[in-house]
Design a protein with these regions (language model features):
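Bacterial N-terminal signal peptides
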Residues: 17-24
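Acidic, polar-rich low-complexity tracts and alpha-helical solenoid repeat scaffolds
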Residues: 2-7, 11, 26-279
Length: 279
């Protein structure tokens, strides 16, 4: 029994050593290949590593492939293999979630090979890169605007394309993020008691975003801003502002007759009506 255990340990150690030697040799061969001038061998190995990276979702293989691809791709432009190599460079960046280089490479691919059978995929992934780059709503939204623009270009070119459903979902999500930003800016004016600015911001928001999921809440905060502005106004301004707040209440009720904010709005409305009796 003891000798069996010893034998098994020796086998495990031997296998481990063989594995380590294989990895070392593999790394050494790869480094030699990087420094060599053998373009054909680089092409073959780059494609092997790329396919391995895609099939096994291996970042390591994709990164290795990319280093080789970037060395040889310029040499194949205008040749039959050029299109394949340019696509692999762009898609490797995309699969590695490098959403800053990926759209640049896909755009270059489309400029070089506009009639490629990979054109639709490249157009979508270029647009999707901006979607993944888009930050939280409270940060700068340049990439969000760019993403909407690029997704719309894709949808215009391929209205029934393979990725059209996903592109629509992404565009909607980005648009909602922009609406969230605009809504929160207006809401911040309300919170900090800049009621005039809040009313103006909510008016703009409602005019610009007719289908927004934040629309009901915007109507409520517009009313509440107008009400709070009115009751804190000088007497000479109060009547006009109370009437405006009442109009905002009626607008909310028209669009949301069973709205979630009606109970608290009715209390404010009663106060408005009582105050208006003094004029």
């Amino acid at each position: 029994m003891y000798f069996c255990q010893m034998f098994l340990r020796m086998i495990k150690k031997a296998l481990l050593i063989v594995g380590m030697l294989t990895v070392t040799l593999s790394c050494s061969e790869y480094q030699k290949l990087l420094k060599s001038d053998d373009t054909a061998q680089k092409y073959t190995r780059a494609e092997e590593l790329y396919n391995q990276g895609i099939e096994k979702d291996s970042d390591k293989s994709l990164k290795r492939s990319l280093r080789l691809l970037e060395q040889i791709e310029p040499q194949f432009r205008g040749k039959p293999q050029g299109q394949r190599l340019a696509y692999m460079v762009a898609n490797a960046h995309y699969q590695l979630e490098d959403y800053y280089l990926a759209p640049f490479e896909f755009e270059r691919f489309l400029q070089l090979y506009p009639n490629s059978d990979k054109a639709e995929e490249a157009e979508f992934k270029m647009a999707a890169s901006y979607f993944y780059r888009s930050p939280k709503y409270n940060l700068d939204q340049t990439d969000t605007h760019k993403g909407i623009e690029k997704l719309q270009i894709y949808l215009n070119k391929y209205p029934d394309g393979e990725y059209s459903d996903k592109a629509n979902e992404m565009a909607t999500a980005l648009q909602t993020k922009l609406e969230k930003k605009a809504f929160e800016i207006a809401k911040q004016y309300h919170k900090t008691q800049y009621y005039k600015a809040a009313i103006a911001s909510f008016n703009n928001f409602l005019a610009d975003n007719p289908g927004s999921p934040f629309r009901e809440e915007a109507y409520f905060y517009r009313f509440d801003s107008a009400y709070l502005l009115a009751i804190n106004s000088f007497q000479v301004l109060m009547e006009e502002r109370l009437k405006e707040a009442k109009d905002f209440y009626e607008t909310y009720k028209k669009y949301y007759p069973e709205g979630q904010y009606l109970p608290q709005m009715k209390d404010a409305l009663e106060d408005i009506n009582n105050r208006l009796q003094n004029f």
